[in-house]
A protein has these predicted regions:
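Structural signature of nuclease core domains in nucleic-acid processing machines
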Residues: 1-212
Length: 212
């Protein structure tokens, strides 16, 4: 093989290794990331997952940063975050969730794909390295909005459902960020998988402040 062919083959092998790792590794439990869920993504059938799930709704109450996060210490706000930032009512919130799936236990999980290089070494994809990346790009706000959008859509489709602590615990499993450059086939750790589950207290506030 020529040098170019060797390089292409190496890239394909690395991609296949990553893909098998992403799909075949038991996912960390967002409620307790040190533990594993009893399934991998390749065990979720097509009927129980949705890709590129778009959402769009009007913020009838506006968006007031200080009111949303005041007194909340479970997330790290970026230094450039302006607590006085606000948008008046009528602002439209929209986005797209990479993957939403329902697990065998009936809970729903949000998955987001990230190709961030971090420090270009697999060791950089440990919990601390991924946390720094989450804080740096404020992906925290992203999964909070995704979670709120999902619950809003679920409540709209199920009028009898009400957001309570018990209902939240039974319905939502959490969010999992897959930093794919740090994942490989047969890995024995959770490197590359950032799993988290926001508190009911925070989600309840966002749900009532952001949804109609």
């Amino acid at each position: 093989l020529s040098r170019n062919e060797d390089e292409q083959k190496a890239r394909l092998e690395a991609f296949a290794d990553m893909l098998e790792g992403v799909l075949g590794t038991q996912l960390p439990d967002p409620a307790n990331p040190e533990k594993r869920l009893p399934f991998a993504l390749n065990q979720i059938d097509m009927a129980h997952r949705r890709s590129e799930l778009d959402f769009k709704y009007r913020l009838e109450k506006g968006f007031y940063a200080q009111r949303l996060f005041e007194g909340i210490d479970e997330i790290a706000l970026p230094q450039e975050w302006a607590p006085e930032y606000k948008k008046e009512s009528g602002w439209v919130l929209n986005g797209s969730i990479d993957l939403l799936f329902q697990a065998p236990d009936g809970k729903y999980y949000i998955v987001d794909w990230k190709t961030n290089a971090l420090n270009s070494r697999r060791e950089g994809f440990n919990r601390q390295g991924m946390q720094e990346e989450m804080d740096k790009h404020f992906y925290t706000l992203q999964y909070l909005l995704y979670t709120t959008a999902f619950l809003h859509a679920y409540a709209k489709s199920n009028p009898e459902w009400k957001l309570t602590q018990e209902a939240y615990d039974e319905l939502f499993g959490g969010a999992i960020y897959c930093f794919v450059r740090g994942i490989h086939k047969g890995q024995g750790d959770a490197n590359g998988f950032y799993a988290t589950r926001p508190s009911f207290r925070l989600i309840e506030r966002l749900f009532h402040e952001l949804t109609p």
